[in-house]
Amino acid sequence: MKRQLTLAQYRSVDLTLFAVILAVCEYVITLAAIRWFPGQLYTVSLTAALCAIVLMRWGAWAGLHAVLGGAVFWFASGGTPQQLVIYGIGNLGCLLVLPLLRGNGKEKIRRDKLFTALFALAVLLAMQLGRAAVALLLGTPWQTCVGFFTTDALSGVFAMVVVSLAGRLDGVFEDQKRYLHRLQEQQKKEKGGF
């Protein structure tokens, strides 16, 4: 007899897989940028893209990935304790986009390619806003905080592309409760059930 996962077990496995993907990719990307392009003003990060996907799939659980992405970036770049706070806590700014997902928001964002790309960009901008706010609270000059928006510009394009591609794959950029329900309905139809 097949043993099915509970929703909580499925969510735990799903969140863990996305966390591992995020940690490995962010670490490699950060090390590559530091070693191969040390003088570059721009950075690329996968954190916003994966947080946008997890926000769509599980909502506020994406906060775990936001903090993880900041911590991995901090660790790989050899940052200061203050930078850990700025990136770890500041990335939680991505949760500011949660109101966009209420009601029919998830479906509208998921189904419309423009809204999908704009959602990914909104997640990145909210993270940058969070980092800037935390940095300002820690006494960082505002001119330095502007750098959170300018140096991460490529990450915005990257996030829009990654999330748009994820939207083309069945169930990847979709609320998982809805996705599992949809799969269950399809299986019933295929078996000739009600």
Language-model features: where?
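Residue-level recognition of pore/gate-forming positions within transmembrane alpha-helices
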Residues: 23-27, 70-71, 91
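Alpha-helical transmembrane segments and their membrane-interface exit regions
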Residues: 51, 91-99
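Membrane-embedded alpha-helical hairpins and interfacial helices in multi-pass inner-membrane proteins
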Residues: 31-41, 80-90, 100-194
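Membrane-helix interface "capping/anchor" motifs
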Residues: 53-67
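Hydrophobic transmembrane alpha-helices
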Residues: 1-57
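Membrane-helix boundary elements
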Residues: 65-86
